[in-house]
């Protein structure tokens, strides 16, 4: 996949989520569709960070929340195209922990939240052998330009 197309509305939603959950990591899903080697965002679904300890540096999404996101996507003929999480007071680059727990095929959007304010975000894809992340291009598009069929 060479890029992810995001609407400003979705960017605003995941940025606000990162700010609301600060100083803990937030997490969530983006539902959308694929067209060729690009993905198109349609909806942001926030998820609860269920990690019991060290939530400032780690997140955990309950398996039932994953299933709910998949079910929601399936019901609308969409896909889970991205998993989003924040890095409180750290850069928007994947950590070794992120790499060790990621799966190929998803975009991973990381939001850098500094002192309670979302300051940047980047999207990453895990390479096929799971050794490193490749940064994806992000294109901001208008909602009305998305054709999911």
Where are the predicted features?
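Residue-level "edge-of-site" marker
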Residues: 86
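Conserved beta-strand-loop surface patch within small alpha/beta domains used
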Residues: 1-80, 89-149
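Conserved, mostly hydrophobic/aromatic
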Residues: 83
């Amino acid at each position: 996949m060479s890029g992810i197309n995001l609407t400003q509305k979705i960017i605003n939603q995941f940025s606000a989520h990162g700010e609301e959950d600060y100083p803990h990591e937030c997490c969530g899903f983006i539902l959308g569709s694929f067209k060729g080697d690009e993905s198109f965002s349609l909806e942001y679904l926030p998820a609860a960070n269920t990690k019991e300890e060290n939530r400032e540096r780690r997140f955990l999404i309950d398996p039932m929340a994953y299933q709910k996101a998949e079910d929601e996507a399936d019901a609308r003929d969409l896909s889970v195209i991205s998993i989003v999480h924040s890095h409180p007071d750290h850069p928007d680059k994947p950590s070794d922990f992120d790499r060790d727990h990621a799966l190929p095929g998803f975009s991973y959007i990381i939001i850098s939240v500094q002192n309670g304010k979302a300051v940047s975000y980047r999207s990453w894809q895990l390479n096929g052998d799971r050794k490193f992340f490749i940064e994806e291009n992000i294109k901001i598009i208008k909602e009305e330009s998305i054709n999911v069929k």
